[in-house]
């Protein structure tokens, strides 16, 4: 049983939009978008297990994506007061034509400046 809270659905809509913008920023190497929307203490666990802080993540993001296409599926947003989980599946095509799938969980907190991503974890998988 979920204890998610979002009485009018507006936060869910905002988080769904932010999730899509996060992916768009990834595909376009939009470091400024990330700089604005990631918490200062942001941390990501990459699909290879490496852990990056915000500065390291921004450096990697500036290099551009290693994929040419990334489509979202199964986006699930759950809100718990001033925290939220966004989980989704991404179907991607690499620059070399390879294809794959990843699943991720992003953790957001609501601040006076709006929702900020504080954590992300990515898992590449062969399961669909």
Where are these regions (language model features)?
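A beta-strand edge to alpha-helix "cap/lid" segment located at domain peripheries
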Residues: 2-36, 41-128
């Amino acid at each position: 049983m979920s204890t998610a809270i979002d009485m009018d659905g507006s936060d869910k809509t905002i988080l769904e939009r932010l999730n899509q913008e996060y992916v768009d920023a990834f595909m376009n190497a939009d470091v400024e978008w990330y700089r604005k929307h990631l918490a200062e203490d942001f941390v990501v666990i990459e699909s290879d297990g490496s852990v990056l802080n915000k500065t390291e993540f921004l450096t990697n993001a500036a290099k551009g994506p290693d994929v040419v296409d990334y489509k979202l599926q199964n986006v699930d947003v759950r809100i718990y007061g001033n925290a939220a989980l966004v989980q989704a599946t991404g179907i991607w095509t690499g620059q070399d034509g390879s294809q794959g799938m990843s699943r991720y969980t992003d953790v957001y907190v609501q601040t006076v400046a709006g929702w900020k991503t504080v954590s992300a974890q990515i898992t590449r998988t062969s399961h669909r």
